[in-house]
Amino acid sequence: MNTSHVRVVTHMCGFLVWLYSLSMLPPMVVALFYKEKSLFVFFITFVIFFCIGGGAWYTTKKSGIQLRTRDGFIIIVMFWILFSVISAFPLWIDSELNLTFIDALFEGVSGITTTGATVIDDVSSLPRAYLYYRSQLNFIGGLGVIVLAVAVLPLLGIGGAKLYQSEMPGPFKDDKLTSRLADTSRTLWITYSLLGIACIVCYRLAGMPLFDAICHGISTVSLGGFSTHSESIGYFNNYLVELVAGSFSLLSAFNFTLWYIVISRKTIKPLIRDIELRFFLLMALGVIIVTSFQVWHIGMYDLHGSFIHSFFLASSMLTDNGLATQDYANWPTHTIVFLLLSSFFGGCIGSTCGGIKSLRFLILFKQSKHEINQLSHPRALLSVNVGGKIVTDRVMRSVWSFFFLYTLFTVFFILVLNGMGYDFLTSFATVAACINNMGLGFGATASSFGVLNDIAKYLMCIAMILGRLEIYPVIILFSGFFWRS
C-alpha cells in the first residue's frame, strides 16, 4: 500500500472520526437538561476527537486519489474499530462509572455493532445521559450496518450480497464507492429515521414514558437491544409494549431498500413480491408458534400470555434485537437453546439484523434441493433460481464459504470459552449473543456479561466485529495476497 493510498484512507477515517465526534452533542444536551456531571465527560470526548479527526481530514484533503476496492475493505474495518474506541472513551474516563478499559470497550463495541450485550450489572442506576447515549450508539450503528449491507458489501461481492443489487432502485445502483456512500446514506437515513419515529410514537401510545420511549424506539429499530432498565422490556410488564417491541423487531429486519421503495412509490407490492421477505416471515411464524406452544405446554403462562411473551422474545432473538422479558432466564433450557439457534438465522440482507441472513439460508436450501433433483436426473440441465434470478456459481461459492467461515469462527469461540472453564451452555449462548449481534446471554451471562474474564471479553469484542462485518472484510486484511500490488 503506497503513501498516496495511506493518505486517502487517513483522509476518509479522519472525516469519519470528525463526523462521529458530533454524536457527543445530543448526550451533552440530555446531561444539561437533567443537570448531570456527565456533561463534562461528553464535552471532553467531543473536543478530543473533533480535533483529531478534523486534523487528519484537513491535512490529507489534497490527496486526489480515487478510492479502490482494497481501500474500501480497510476503511470498513477502521470505521468500526475507531467508532468502537470513541464510543468507549466517555464510559472509560468517567470515574463515577468505575469501568475498566476492557469493560468500557466491550460496552462501546456492543453498542456500535448493535449487539446490546452489557457488562453493567445495574443499568437502571446509570445517569440518564448514559442511558440515552447507549441507545444512540445502537441507532448510529444501525445506520452504519444498513449502509454497509446495501451500499458496500454488494459492491465488494461479499457472501452473496450482490445477488439483489440489480433489484435496487436509484441511488443504490451506482458502482462507485464514494457516490454510493453519500447518496445511499442520505436516502437510508430518512427511511431509517421515519421507522424510528414511528416506533417511538407506538411505544408512547402503549404507555411507555417519553424518555424510555425515545431510548427504546431508537434501539429497537436498530435491533440493538440496549434498554434503560436492567429488566429490559420486562420492566414495564405491559403486553402492548411487548407487542410493539416484537412488531418493530420484525419490521426492522426487512431489507431497507424495500422500505425505501414502499415509501417512495407508496405501494406495498414490493413487500409482497420479495421472496426473501416471504421466507423470513415464514420462518418467524414457525419460531413464534413453536415457542408459544413450548411455554404454554409447561404452564408458565396462560394461552394469551404465552403467545404475547413468545411473540416478543422469539421476534427479538430471531432478528438479533436482544430486548427481553424479565424472566426469560427461567424459561425451559430447550426453548432458550431453540431461540439461540434461531438467532443464527437473522433477518433479511440489507437490514440492521445480525446472523447469517435469510437470503443465504434460502440460497442454501435451493442449492440442496437442486442437488437432489440433479442426482435424480443426472443428465438434466438444471439451475438454482431465487426470485426468478439464476444464482451464479460465483454467488453460490461466496455463500457456502461465508457459511463455512461463520460456523468455523462460532465453533472456535465456543471451544475457547469452554476451555476457559465456562460451561457449554454459557459458552454457546455467549458466542451466539456476540457473533450474531443479538446480545442476550444465558447461563452465567444471563444477567450481565461482566462475569467474563478480560481475555473472554476481548475475544467477544472480536466476535461482535466479525459478525457485524460479515467475516470477510476483517480476515481479508490478514491475507498476504490482499497486500500485493
Residue positions per predicted region:
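Membrane-proximal intracellular helices of multi-pass ion channels
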Residues: M1-S485
